[in-house]
Curated annotation (Swiss-Prot):
Residues 204-239 have a biased composition (Basic and acidic residues). NCBIfam families: PRK13262.1. The gene is ureE. Coiled coil: none annotated. GO terms for cellular component: cytoplasm. The lineage of its organism: Bacteria, Pseudomonadati, Pseudomonadota, Gammaproteobacteria, Enterobacterales. One of its GO terms (molecular function) is nickel cation binding. InterPro entries: UreE (IPR012406), UreE_N (IPR004029), UreE_N_sf (IPR036118). Keywords: Chaperone, Cytoplasm, Nickel, Nickel insertion. Residues 185-239 are annotated as: Disordered. The keyword Manganese does not apply. This is Urease accessory protein UreE.
Amino acid sequence: MILIEHILGNVKKDPVWQAKLKDATFDLLVLDQREAQKSRCRKLSTQGLDLGISLDRHVVLADGDVLAWDEKTNVAVVVQINLRDVMVIDLSELKSRSPDELIKTCFELGHALGNQHWKAVTKNNEVYVPLTVATTMMDSVMRTHGFQHLPFRFVKGAEILPLLSNSEARLLFGGAEDTDTHVHVASPLDEPHGSGLHIHGIHSHGDGHSHSHDSHSHSHDSDHGHSHSHGDHDHDHKH
């Protein structure tokens, strides 16, 4: 195993390393966004080098980081980070609204995003949300909750990463792929509970276990009796 304790430079940001590695062969260490947030990990490069990453805890790997360079063979070990796409919600339009409208919209947007268990970072009048489901599903959530007046778009994660601090990058990208598939396409906040589509995926918990929810429905009548359908069994409740 080759121990990596320091980052030599960055081939995408540092002109010196760009010139030095102009004709070099890159042996890539490919990381997903969760792995990139770790200061310690062990993984093979694309050419089979066994690399042990042991960086200071405050150091976060970035796309293009040079971890090793053999001047004789002109081969460099370079980090390639595969980031998820990001939904960018532009809040600039809210500046022209009344304080009451601004507060109401921000509260309802936060509620809608939180109800999906989606991570988010707010910066520069924009909200960044990493994709954990299809863009069509995220688009549906935004429009169903009445936020079509807020411009939003989908961009590559690499476009957003330079705008973030290390802590913001960890919050936005660290473990985003572990977020539960938990999509609710429901009516706005003032609608009665139960009017809408709920799709639950697998939930992971810190205690080491996970569980899944089959598609289920809840119906509520006037005396608050309700029925549940859970996979292969049904039961009724009266209160």
